[in-house]
Every structure is written in C-alpha cells, then in structure tokens.
Regions:
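Flexible, solvent-exposed loop/hinge segments and secondary-structure transition points
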Residues: 2-196
Length: 196
C-alpha cells in the first residue's frame, strides 16, 4: 500500500474521518444507554420518595407538580393513602463547598420533616457524603420531626439548633439551606392549592 504524503490536506481529511467515526460511536452509545439510565434514575427517585414519605398507595413520581419560588423551580411529589393527602416529597438543592448538593425532603401535612434522601452531591468524599446519614432520625444532627416554618433550620455555629457535620460546616449549611428551600416550595404549593 502506498503511503500518503504528509500534507495539510491529508491531515485534515484524516482528522475529519476520525472525528466522524468517534462522533458516530459516541452518538450510538448515547442512544443505547439513554433509556436504561432514565429507568435507573426513575427507580432511584421512586425509592427515595418511598423513604421520605412512607406509606402511600399512589405513585407520586408519576405526576410531580412544579412550584416556583424566587425564580427557582422545585418538583413536588404528593403522596396519598386511600385518597387522603399524607405528605409530599420536595426536590431541592443548594451550593456546598464542592458544588451542588441535591436533596429530596419529605414533609407531613403539618410541614414537619418526615425524612430526607441525599440524591447527589459534589462535596469532599468522606465529609460531604456524611450528610446522607448525619441528619437522620436518632443521629447527631437529627432534623426529623422539625418544622422549618416554625424556625428555619441552621447549624448551632450560626445560632441554630442543628449540630453541623464534624469538619464540614459548609456542607451542613448547604444541606440545611436546601431543606429550608424545600419547605418554602412545599408551603407555597400548599398555599396555591388552598386558593384553587
């Protein structure tokens, strides 16, 4: 086989050919994996809703509502049992030390926190990931049963009554900001439903 001459034209053709092949392969892989990824994410969300608002008999993930608070849109998943409203799960996020921290917070009809699930974070491994358990029932920073409408949740370092994660105050603040934002969305959604 004859060797091609090293010229600008031949290099451009070779680079274009490689780019087209690589782009086609990436597009194909994206097409093949998009549906399984979407299904896995839907299952993660459904499982998280079941943790933060247990005992429902509807499918809250099927018909989320969107509520806008201060220009930010929040998804709210209403849970019912026997047609009665038993609570809602609210997706919220805020910026922590390493990036976005995304949570799903469950509220009962009175606005008390039932539970939460840390959906994703970009915090320091080993520190930021502690938020997944630190604020759970019985843990050191337990927020379950609290109503952010009565008093916004803040860390004790800022005059609040929630213990921050050891060596991770910024993450703790970000987590509590996300929980407080979730409550605001929940409260606005509840107010909107009462006026309809």
């Amino acid at each position: 086989m004859k060797k091609l001459e090293s010229s600008l034209k031949n290099m451009a053709l070779a680079l274009t050919g490689f780019s087209v092949i690589a782009g086609g392969l990436l597009g194909w892989v994206n097409n093949v994996t998009a549906e399984p990824i979407a299904q896995a994410n839907a299952k993660i969300l459904s499982d998280a809703i079941a943790v933060v608002v247990p005992g429902f008999d509807n499918n809250p993930a099927e018909a989320p509502e969107s509520v806008e608070v201060e220009g930010v849109s929040y998804k709210i998943y209403k849970a019912t049992k026997g047609g009665e409203f038993i609570g809602a799960a609210v997706e919220s996020s805020s910026m922590g030390f390493g990036g976005e921290l995304k949570v799903l917070v469950g509220f009962d009809p009175e606005g008390k926190i039932i539970d939460y699930s840390l959906l994703s974070h970009s915090e320091t491994p080993g520190l930021g990931s502690k938020a997944a358990e630190w604020f759970k029932k019985g843990a050191k920073g337990d927020i379950t049963g609290k109503n952010p409408g009565e008093k916004a949740l803040t860390v004790s370092k800022d005059g609040g009554d929630v213990d921050a994660i050891t060596a991770s105050t910024i993450t703790s603040r970000a987590f509590l900001v996300a929980v407080n934002k979730a409550f605001e969305a929940y409260k606005n959604q509840s107010a909107n439903n009462e006026t309809k």
